């Protein structure tokens, strides 16, 4: 049985879905105004692993993750670049897909966008207002936090501690400093939507509440996101949704730890970040993903060249074992002692499942993989081997690889479509910024990989050369 650490109760709990065999899962997605750094890539990678494992264990998973495609940061970026908000958002949504696809993150079943969910967001706020949980003030709408019983239950904070906390801004339009914004009145010349409270746009927290309700219903099984989202974002999502429906928003809350660099959280505001699309040029995307999964998702992971090189070497060892198994298979007849080895392989599978059942411990599951490789190497040193055993080893590597989203078979060094598109996008940006040196460098890199670019009036086209 799968157990997972529920941030709501601070305990590891057996996973019991609302509907047998089905999982409704939501993960807060990115605000699309720049490229993702490797810290931002951790939530998509680890929750993709969780989704894959739940699927492996027989659940039918519906996975939803949003795009925040209008917000202060995007508006600021658009103003700086002299572009439309929609153009900036579109570009970075493409870049997000390109990076996460290279990292072998499966697309969500649904990727709702704020700008496409506006009617539902407005209806959600209007219903909160009707119930007395929201009030209008000068074109803004706020949530009446103290009216919601249970505010603070996720982050474990009492209302009065929050009140004195420095993170709450004081704004005289609010009835109470704890109240937070649901709808923001538009500033002059700012992108806006019509609403019962005038022209404006939604606050950040309300989007997720409205999108979850629309796409998955009132109560979902798992709500996931980075640890920094616990407060205020997730606390506010709970308040909005539960005030409206009277039902629990999510039965299980999962929060991933940070990617640190020199023991400090990697973040855009600190400027200590490494972009995902840069690091996957230096190491393969597979190595980056494997590296990420060598730590348990809740523990902080330090980002360093040394650790990445370690992950690269480890992955190489596993791939070599698999290549040797394949090679051996081609020249083996069916003979040798089978039962003992088949039992060993079945035992490894059992241990892998036990580790993953225990709060998705991919770190320990990967050490089971290394043990499996060790066993495989011992087996191959025997004089006589059997096709059946070699196949059983290979099947298990393939099975684990599918769960982790990392392939252990050797591949030609070929660029994936998504990586090519990411590079072309980066070249477009470089050209726009008149950074022609970088633009040429990218053209050369693509040429080296036999990708031919063609500038057309409709934009850049590409094809693989012969
Ligand atoms: N270092 C990190 N490790 C793991 N997850 C992270 C890290 N930084 C951000 N995230 C996650 O990435 C997503 C986007 O976060 P956000 O845009 O706040 O990134 P950021 O770099 O921290 O930006 P800022 O410094 O502007 O807050 C969130 O889900 C957040 O939890
Ligand atoms: Zn959210």
From Swiss-Prot:
GO terms for biological process: cysteinyl-tRNA aminoacylation. GO terms for cellular component: cytosol. CDD domains: CysRS_core. It comes from the Bacteria. Keywords: Aminoacyl-tRNA synthetase, ATP-binding, Cytoplasm, Ligase, Metal-binding, Nucleotide-binding, Phosphoprotein, Protein biosynthesis, Zinc. Its cofactor is Zn(2+). It is an enzyme of class 6 (ligase). Belongs to the class-I aminoacyl-tRNA synthetase family. This is Cysteine--tRNA ligase. The modification Phosphoserine is found at residue 269. Zn(2+) binds at residues 28, 208, 233, 237. GO terms for molecular function: ATP binding; cysteine-tRNA ligase activity; zinc ion binding. It is found in: Cytoplasm. Its EC number is 6.1.1.16. Monomer. It catalyses: tRNA(Cys) + L-cysteine + ATP = L-cysteinyl-tRNA(Cys) + AMP + diphosphate. ATP binds at residue 268. SMART domains: DALR_2 (SM00840). Binds 1 zinc ion per subunit. The lineage of its organism: Bacteria, Bacillati, Bacillota, Bacilli, Bacillales. It comes from Shouchella clausii (strain KSM-K16). A motif ('HIGH' region) lies at residues 30-40.
């Amino acid at each position: 049985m799968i157990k997972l650490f529920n941030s709501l109760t601070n305990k590891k709990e057996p996973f019991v879905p609302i509907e047998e065999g089905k999982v409704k899962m939501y993960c807060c997605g990115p605000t699309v105004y720049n490229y993702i750094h490797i810290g931002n890539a951790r939530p998509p990678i680890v929750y993709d692993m969780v989704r894959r494992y739940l699927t492996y264990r027989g659940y039918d998973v519906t996975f939803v993750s949003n795009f925040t495609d209008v917000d202060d940061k995007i508006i600021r970026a658009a103003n700086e670049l002299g572009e439309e908000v929609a153009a900036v958002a579109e570009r970075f949504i493409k870049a997000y897909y390109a990076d996460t696809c290279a990292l072998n993150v499966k697309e969500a079943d649904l990727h709702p966008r704020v700008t496409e969910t506006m009617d539902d967001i407005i209806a959600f706020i209007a219903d909160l207002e009707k119930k007395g949980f929201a009030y209008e003030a000068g074109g803004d709408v706020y949530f009446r936090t103290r009216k919601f019983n249970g505010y603070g239950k996720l982050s474990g904070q009492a209302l009065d501690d929050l009140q004195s906390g420095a993170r709450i801004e004081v704004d005289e339009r609010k009835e109470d400093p704890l109240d937070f914004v649901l709808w923001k009145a538009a500033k002059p010349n700012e992108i806006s939507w019509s609403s019962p409270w005038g022209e404006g746009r939604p606050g950040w927290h309300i989007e997720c509440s409205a999108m979850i309700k629309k796409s998955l219903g009132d109560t979902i099984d798992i709500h996931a996101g980075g640890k920094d989202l616990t407060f205020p974002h997730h606390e506010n999502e709970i308040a909005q949704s539960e005030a409206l429906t009277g039902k629990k928003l999510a039965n299980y809350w999962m929060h991933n730890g940070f990617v640190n660099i020199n023991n400090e959280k990697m973040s855009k505001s600190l400027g200590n970040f490494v972009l995902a699309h840069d690091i996957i040029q230096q190491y393969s995307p597979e190595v980056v993903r494997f590296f990420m999964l060598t730590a348990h998702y809740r523990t902080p992971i330090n980002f360093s060249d040394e650790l990445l090189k370690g992950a690269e070497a480890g992955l190489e060892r596993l791939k070599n074992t698999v290549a040797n198994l394949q090679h051996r298979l081609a020249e083996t007849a069916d003979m040798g002692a089978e039962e003992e080895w088949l039992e060993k392989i079945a035992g490894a599978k059992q241990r892998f499942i036990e580790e993953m059942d225990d709060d998705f411990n991919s770190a320990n599951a990967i050490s089971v993989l290394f043990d499996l490789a060790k066993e495989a190497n011992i087996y191959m040193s025997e004089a006589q081997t059997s096709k059946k055993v070699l196949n059983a080893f290979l099947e298990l590597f393939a099975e684990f690889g599918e769960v982790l989203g990392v392939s252990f078979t050797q591949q030609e060094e070929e660029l994936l479509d998504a990586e090519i598109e990411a590079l072309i996008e980066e070249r477009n940006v470089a050209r726009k910024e008149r950074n022609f040196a970088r633009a040429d460098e990218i053209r050369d890199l693509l040429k080296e990989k036999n990708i031919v670019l063609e500038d057309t009036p409709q934009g850049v086209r590409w094809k693989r050369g012969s």
